[in-house]
Amino acid sequence: MPLISSIVLLAYVATVSPAARERMGPTIRLVSLVLSLAMLVLTTAMFFGSQYIEGTLDWTTLSFGSFNYEYSTVWIESLGIYWSVGMDALSFPMVWLTTFLLPVTIVATWNEKNAAVYFPLVLMMGGALIGVFVALDLFMFYVFWELTLIPMFFLILKWGGYDRKYASQKFFIYTFTASVIMLLGLVTVYFLQPEGLSRAGTWTGRTFDIPTLTAHAQAANAGGAWFLGESLQKIL
C-alpha cells in the first residue's frame, strides 16, 4: 500500500465497533498512542527518505504542480473520480504537524475516562485532516473535509466544556452551511469545465483531478481566456 494512503488509513484502525472498544478497555489508550506514533514515524521517514524512494524528486527542488509520493487509482471511474494523493513542499509540513500533534494530544489527555470513544475520535479527525492535505482530487478533498467535521462535532458536544451543546449546535449550522456552499462550488467547477480533460472511461468527459484543473487554468490564463470558459462569464 502507498505510504500516504497507509498514514491516512492507520488513523482508522482504532475505530472498531463500540463493543470491541469496550472490551479493550484501557488498552485503547495504548493502541491509539502506538498508531499515532507510527503515523509520525512514517511521515518523518518520508521526508528524509524521499530522494531514495522517489528517485530524483526532493522537497527543495519540487516545481509547482509536482508532488512526492504521488499515487492515483480509480475510485468512481464513470464520474472521473480517483483516489489520488500526493504531497508537495506546502502540504508536507501540514501533514507532519498533524501527525506530531496526535500523540501529543493523546498523552496530554491520557486520563480521559471515556477513552473508548474519545481517542478513536481524535485519530479519526487526524486521519481525515491528513486526507484533506494530501488529496489531489476535488471530490476526495470534499469527502475528507466532511470527515473532519463529524468527529469534531462529537468532541465539542461531549468534551467542549461549558455550554458545549450550544457550541456544537453553532458548529453544525456554520459547517453545514459552508459545506453546502463548497459542494455547489465543486459541482460548478465540474460541469463548467470543458469536456475532454478527464481520463478515458468517464461518462461526462470531465474530471475532479486538481493538477489537471490547475494546468488547464494556467494554460487558459496564459492565453487570456477565462478558466471555465464562456459559461462562467455568462453567470457572472
Q: What do these predicted ranges mean?
A:
Residues 1-15:
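N-terminal amphipathic, basic-rich helices that act as targeting or association modules
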Residues 5, 98-106, 154-156, 185:
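Membrane-interfacial alpha-helical segments at the cytosolic side of multi-pass membrane proteins
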Residues 5-8, 39, 94, 101, ...:
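Hydrophobic residues within membrane-embedded alpha-helical segments of Major Facilitator Superfamily
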Residues 11-107, 116-120, 195, 200-231:
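Transmembrane helix-loop-helix hairpins at membrane boundaries of multipass inner-membrane proteins
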Residues 12, 16, 22-28, 124, ...:
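Alpha-helical multi-pass transmembrane bundles of energy-transducing inner-membrane proteins
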Residues 66, 73-75, 110, 145, ...:
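Tryptophan-centered motif/residue detector
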Residues 112-114:
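Conserved, non-catalytic sequence blocks in retroelement Pol enzymes and Pol-derived host proteins
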